């Protein structure tokens, strides 16, 4: 494993843990989250899942790209399912679509070797 692969893997896991934590605490405990409108919330979802996806792709895991990105999408789906049952959160289908757009954008950029 190259040095950069390890670096990206560490960032990938830190990102997953951070997003997982921020997704299960009540939204009112996150500063400025209430100030987000619908569009900025969806943009934030896309950027977060772009970040996670590009870090996962740059990590050079032995998983295939489709499998890695499917697992990242399932991570987002699990978060939304948790939100459905969370008293201070709510499930939004649009969040899943924003997550998916971030994942596809990361794949597109990675495939074009821009990353």
Each model region followed by its residue ranges:
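Alpha-helical transmembrane segments of multipass membrane proteins
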Residues: 17-20, 54-55, 77, 81, ...
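Alpha-helical transmembrane segments that form the membrane-embedded catalytic/substrate-binding core
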Residues: 45, 49, 91-110
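Short helix-capping/hinge motifs at transmembrane helix termini and TM-loop junctions
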Residues: 25-26, 60-61, 87
């Amino acid at each position: 494993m190259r040095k950069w692969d390890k670096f990206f893997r560490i960032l990938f896991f830190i990102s997953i843990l951070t997003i997982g934590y921020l997704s299960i605490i009540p939204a009112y405990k996150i500063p400025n989250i209430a100030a987000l409108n619908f569009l900025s919330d969806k943009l934030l979802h896309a950027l977060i899942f772009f970040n996670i996806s590009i870090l996962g792709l740059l990590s050079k895991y032995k998983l295939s790209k489709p499998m890695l990105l499917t697992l990242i999408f399932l991570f987002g789906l699990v978060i939304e399912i948790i939100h459905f049952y969370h008293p201070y959160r709510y499930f939004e289908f649009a969040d899943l679509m924003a997550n998916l757009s971030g994942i596809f954008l990361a794949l597109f950029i990675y495939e074009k070797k821009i990353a």
